């Protein structure tokens, strides 16, 4: 397990007042204790270990900014992705900061904020290997995926249909290594992670992308609507002032469009059309800067 990093955030009275309407109960109302959350610290560029110690990445910056706007301290722990949801349910974590793909199944088990990034699925192959131009090209291949991720679910659901095998790994870095070593023909990961892997590893390259229409969002326990709504308010404000878009440009090298999840603000709280979505029109309360 990676070392825990605590970010001390100075409380600002204006922000506290701005969030007062949504901080009514649960962990988010306990101002004396830091928010506790976790990430897969091998899931670059969303979260990764710095050489000098500590964590960095898109989701680390997102978590720091979220805590700042809530006037809270935050503890971000690095662990395997498969341990994050059990940790949330055991109340080890107040929410999951790691990218969690929102699916109908997951929306029945957790409360989500609105999405902060769109997530498509991209294959990574060894450089020089034949490109994957359609899902039919997966026949006879072995796909490496991160255990407990949406990519494992996708490969499990589609392996028989497209006649491929899949292996699961404790983290995505090991899945990419399986491609580099020839133990797997391709790795399936989110589009941002796949692009980063190819950028950092000249021996691999990206290929076919599966369009999903899915988003990444912050995950909370079903009984913590107050926490979800507090974080949701802050996230909406971060979209409105361009913070999420700037973080995407910093870490992924692209500027999200007007309809991208990093920019578009939902009318209610949660992911529209799925369980847990609150259709009540929600006007974010943002502190003046």
Annotated model-derived regions:
Residues 38-43, 77-82, 91-103, 119, ...:
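Beta->alpha turn/N-cap motifs
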Residues 41, 117-125, 195-235, 254-276, ...:
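Periplasmic-binding protein-like
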Residues 27-55, 130-132, 136-142, 271-289:
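Immediate post-signal peptide segment of exported/extracytoplasmic ligand-binding proteins
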Residues 72, 100-102, 114-164:
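A conserved helix-loop-strand patch within extracytoplasmic ligand-binding domains
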Residues 60-69, 129, 136, 142, ...:
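Extended ligand-binding regions for polar small-molecule ligands
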Residues 30-99:
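Extracytoplasmic small-molecule ligand-binding "clamshell" domains
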Residues 60, 75-86, 130, 166-181, ...:
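Short helix-initiation/N-cap motifs at beta->coil->alpha
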Residues 83-86, 98-108, 156-157, 178-212:
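A ligand-binding cleft/hinge motif common to bilobed small-molecule-binding domains
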